[in-house]
Amino acid sequence: MFGYSPNFTLTKIEIDMFNDDFFDDDFRDIENLVIEFHRMKKGESHGLLSEDDFEYLIDYFEANYDKENATYACEVATTLFPFSSTLLLRKAEWLMDQKKYGQALNVLDQLDEVDPNNIESIFLQSDIFLEQNRFSEAVDILERNADKFDSVDKTDILLELSEIYDELEEFDKVYTTLKRILTYEPTNEDALLRICFWAEINNKHEDSISLHQEIIEQTPFNAMAWYNLGVAYQGLKLYEKAIDAYDYCLAIDDKFEYAYRNQGDAYMQLKKYDKAIEVLEMHLSIAKPEDVILDAIGYCWDKQKQYSKARHYYRRASQLNPQDDQIFYKIGETYTKELQWEKAMKAYSIALHINKNNASYCLALGNCLMEMHADKEAMICYLNAVQLRPDIKSTWQALVKALYTISYFEEALSQLGIAEEHCGHKTEFIYNKAAILLSQGKTKEAVLQLEHALTENNKKISALKYIDNEIVHHPVFAEVLVRYKKKK
């Protein structure tokens, strides 16, 4: 219509002109500053550069990995502005980054003359000492300067100091440093959060109780202080007092997740499983589900013999952490208590599949198989158990019992001998041997072994019943037991 076709193709220069960055004031400013800087460097006529300009240039050169110009800018800046604490600090930071620690400390000495209470200089000196593994000097400079400052800066210094003590594994000093903060700033969240952990590490429960009681007197609505008080009571196994402290914490902040968690544990320690479930369910209602919480609720139902409910929570826990073999073992245990051997076997098998080196799982699986009359398969499980943990007597006892059950008496005696080689002398093995010998018809030997075991430790007679619950009623053994009681 107009006789030509418009060309909308732009050149690269034109595209750049439409780029927002092209019109960015900062970009233009730094470009001009760099030009002036290079003119100055060449000795040419140049515009005046201010303190802020030099700080901007140093940052620019550092960001662009221009070590030569960053170093030159630092030198010129501190020559032109020798009393600028900002530029002296920036130069020291640059020198530290270049690992020129001695030069950096010299610059900080100059800064100390200009601005003796510059907190950033104190932190930087400490950092330099730490880089050189001069830990005592890092601690000393922070300790010497902490009381020079008001609460906020003082707190920053003491928090830094506590971290250094942590690195040095001087854990008692970590606790005392955090305590110093709370004596003048009882609501400091960082210190309150950290001191709870360090009170436990240093077994400072009683001191922590006194400290937090004082804090609560000053700030009664301090939820974190009530929580820490509860943790301290719990550390001393004063569970009722811990529960009361958590109640106050939750009255102030009903979204305090760890208070629910710890209170639930305190109720569990007191075997108040209903209350524990109630509290842990509250935790689930306000927080993202966690396998440890679901596992704990399952445990509480388990203890109340509500096995179906226990399994429900164990399974929910396993969905969040499918590689936790112990959860599947616990599921198997609930089925075992209900004598549901096949289901128990499946749960134990999953646990063993995840953790093939757990002797307890092999034993549990073997016990299920024995109950299901799968004797040979059970024997394999027991043999695996003793191979995994030959130092535990219970694995050998399970194997011996299985051999006894299927009337492999000689093999059972042989395994008892091997068990003693690995575990040493055990009274339980003597009781086991007595039962086996009696079943072989070796009455005199059996009686001698039983009498020996009773003399050695009569309280372990359950080992005899473990092998064969009815054997204590055998006339021969019954007579020995009656005679032994009369002697007593």
Q: Where do the model's predicted regions map?
A:
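Position-specific recognition of the canonical hydrophobic site in helix A of tetratricopeptide repeat
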Residues: 62, 96, 130, 166, ...
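Canonical positions in the second alpha-helix
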Residues: 77, 110-111, 145-147, 180-181, ...
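Structural marker of alpha-solenoid helical repeat scaffolds
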Residues: 80, 113-115, 148-150, 184, ...
